[in-house]
């Protein structure tokens, strides 16, 4: 491969507040807006995009293949592949790393990578709903907490505490 791997365009949506101005927009709506803007800024024809890699962790209730939905909403053609990645806070970065690898391997010449999320639109979950509740009380789970903000291995521990622990251990500053 003789060409350098470069970032040609970048875009993001403004930071939204929980249940704020972007409440009516699903993650794939926000991702689609970012894709559209990044591709326009790049000057590359949307028809040249070979693959879309987009991180999204809170997928419940969005429908199948959120990255594919975002790609279509971003004006990309059906010929572009799309993969949704779920690696918690690192999903968008991992998407960019995979994009680099695809470009380096020559799998594609143009790849769109990023991440999208809407905590506001994360639904509540009834984990026993499929099999049926028989008698008595049970729980409804907050998808945002269960699959996003609480550690899966240490029940009830907020993911933010890991960042605080790393900051203290390695003397990171804001």
Language model region names:
Residues 1-80, 118-174:
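Conserved "HGTGT" condensation-loop signature of ketosynthase/thiolase-family condensing enzymes
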